[in-house]
Design a protein with these regions (language model features):
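Residue-level recognition of tetratricopeptide repeat
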Residues: 2, 66, 100, 135, ...
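Register position in tetratricopeptide repeats
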Residues: 6, 70, 104, 139-140, ...
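Single-residue signature of alpha-solenoid repeat helices
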Residues: 13, 77, 111, 146-147, ...
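Hydrophobic/aromatic packing residues within the alpha-helices of TPR/SEL1-like helical repeat arrays
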Residues: 17, 81, 115, 150-154, ...
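Structural marker of alpha-solenoid helical repeat scaffolds
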Residues: 23, 87, 118-123, 156-157, ...
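TPR alpha-solenoid repeat register
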Residues: 29-30, 60, 94, 128-129, ...
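Canonical tetratricopeptide repeat
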Residues: 32, 63, 97, 132, ...
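TPR-adjacent "capping" and linker segments in tetratricopeptide-repeat scaffold/adaptor proteins
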Residues: 45-60, 193-196, 200
Length: 354
């Protein structure tokens, strides 16, 4: 985009941005699309010039920094970021990656200090700032204060775009306010074209929210529509199949879907857990143990996985080990009240009908 704008090919730049969806685009692409939509072409040259060798080298170093960051090598990532910023100090958007690196290193004070450099005039980067501040509040305090912060700031935004609606819906979903999440996912879906690349993902997220409030009819409808758009999506197949297993509904069909999901994403711990649980429900406890053991090794802090593994161990007459894993769940902060109540009963009575 920068090259097209700098060479006066604004209409070509517009054509490119027409195909960009805010929801699934990078931060920089979204900000560039926003500038073009608002005829702020001059903003590109304020931060980058294709004719400036330092700017071009700085961009290359920024890409290297991204690669190191994606491998969790934050020290090397910051090294290349500092070089990039030295060569092109105008490109303040490097700061977003520096902030992410500090955040993942749990250095929240440094992250908060740098976040203040992102101003309202660049609305996508400012929204990134608000989201990251909310995430830090969640880490340092709690999810409720985090949600209140992002909601109050969202209300001040004039004509929020679909990306902002999407992010707010995700905040509501993370905070288990599923009805509010559904409202915002629905607003997005109502605005999307049928050919939109992101529609299946939004349907999946809304379906998951419906499932959490036990509105299974609407949940199934969303999951199935998402699968019509993207038939091989492993995560939608997994979520729908697991929901059916929990409801003792279409067990054979659920197993078939899980096998497809597992073939596509055999390293995903949630899918491994689901297929293990499917074998448990079909009373193939040896196969179930194989998968659930792997899942609990990959996610030792997940309460559902530990509960499932405990159930399988019980059915294999390894009752002391079963109680050990159930007891683990009782110590986990993420364990929901309903699960804790069930495990307290199992700790005393064991598995019923075993």
């Amino acid at each position: 985009m920068s090259y097209l704008v700098e060479t006066g090919k604004n209409e070509d730049a517009k054509k490119i941005t027409n195909d960009i969806e805010f929801i699934n685009s990078t931060l920089l692409l979204s900000q560039g699309k926003s500038w073009i939509e608002n005829n702020q072409y001059y903003r590109f040259q304020e931060v980058f010039s294709c004719k400036n060798y330092n700017d071009v080298i700085a961009e290359f170093l920024f890409l290297i920094s991204n690669l190191y960051s994606s491998d969790d090598n934050f020290e090397k990532s910051n090294f290349y970021l500092n070089l990039s910023s030295f060569l092109n100090p105008k490109f303040k958007f490097n700061l977003s990656l520096i902030i992410e690196n500090h955040y993942f290193n749990k250095d929240y004070n440094k992250a908060k200090k740098i976040l203040k450099n992102l101003k309202k005039e660049d609305k996508f980067y400012y929204w990134f700032r608000l989201k990251k501040e909310a995430q830090i509040i969640s880490k340092e305090r709690n999810d409720k204060e985090s949600l209140n912060f992002i909601v109050s700031n969202f209300k001040r935004i004039n004509q929020p775009n679909k990306k902002f609606l999407f992010d707010l819906a995700n905040f509501y979903k993370k905070s288990k306010e599923y009805k509010n999440a559904i409202d915002y996912y629905t607003k997005i879906i109502d605005e999307l074209d049928d050919e939109s690349d992101v529609k299946s993902d939004i349907l999946y997220r809304r379906g998951a929210s419906y499932e959490r409030i036990k509105d299974y009819e609407k949940a199934d409808r969303d999951f199935l529509e998402a699968l019509e758009i993207n038939p091989g999506d492993a995560y939608t197949l997994n979520y729908l199949a697991y929901s059916w297993l929990e409801r003792d509904y279409k067990i054979d069909k659920a197993m078939d879907m899980l096998k497809i999901a597992y073939e596509a994403e055999s390293d995903d711990p949630y899918i491994i857990d689901s297929i293990g649980w499917a074998y448990f429900l079909t009373r193939d406890y040896l196969k179930a143990e194989k998968f659930l053991k792997q899942a609990v090794e990959l996610m030792p802090e997940d309460p559902i996985v530990n509960d499932h593994y405990g159930d399988i161990l019980w059915m294999l007459d390894r009752k002391i080990q079963a109680r050990y894993f159930w007891n683990n769940v009782l110590q986990m902060k993420e364990a929901e009240k309903e699960l804790i109540e069930k495990i307290n009963i199992k700790m005393i009575e064991g598995l019923k009908n075993s």
